[in-house]
Amino acid sequence: MKTIRLFLLGVCLGLAHAAGAQSYLPQKSAFSIGAGPMWGIVEGKGNFHDEVGATTCGFFGMEYRYYAIPNIALGVAYNHLWGSKDNNSLSCNYVAPTFTARWLWAEDRQGFWMTVGVGYFGYKDDLTYGDEFKKGYLGASFSVGYEFAIAGGVGLQLRADCLAADFKYNGYRYGHSHHYYDDWDSSMSYLSLGVALVFGK
């Protein structure tokens, strides 16, 4: 019995070593999908976090990358932000072309990357003491992350994502945000810390 256990242990270790030797991160194209908690890091006068108070929201993201070389990629990203508190709700959608720079090591099984993008940021909130507010803005994104391979062409990312846009306060909200003037310019920024699964070739 002891011999069988040692044999099985040896087989498992051998398979694990073989899998590790064959694992690598995508080099040509990659698709990632992930999620995590999200916080507002700038007050953004008149927006959801300012009106209902600081609250943790949710973040969901998808991204496609085409690697011109293993260290440089062009792609497109989609992010969805949502939150609710005391029957007040937030829903934002962001889509943008992206540029990624990546540094690989450990025989292409580990990497660190940075991604920037500029695109459309669609903001919508619905507050219990006011009407729904919905508007599109020019948005920007900055993301950094560490990724490691778990199989051939499959990896896991630990990432931080920051989204920002210029929040144009206007008279539509004046009825219940009377402590601000019309056309008050303010920025809004969000930070998410999450994980993502990436796969490709």
Please report, for each region that a protein language model flagged, where it lies by residue.
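Cleavable N-terminal export/targeting peptides
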Residues: 1-28, 200-201
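Short glycine/proline- and aromatic-enriched beta-strand/turn motifs that initiate or cap beta-hairpins
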Residues: 21-67, 73-74, 188-201
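Residues that define the transmembrane beta-barrel architecture of outer-membrane proteins
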Residues: 27-29, 52-58, 91-97, 110, ...
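Residues on the lipid-exposed face of transmembrane beta-strands in outer-membrane beta-barrel proteins
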Residues: 35-37, 62-66, 76-78, 97-103, ...
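Structural signature of outer-membrane beta-barrel domains
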Residues: 38-42, 81-85, 119-125, 163-169, ...
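Outer-membrane beta-barrel translocator domains and adjoining extracellular loop/strand segments
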Residues: 43-51, 85-92, 124-133, 168-177
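Repeated loop/turn-to-beta-strand initiation elements of outer-membrane beta-barrel proteins
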Residues: 70-74, 109-112, 150-156, 201
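Predominantly the C-terminal beta-signal and adjacent terminal strand-loop region
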Residues: 140-142, 147-201
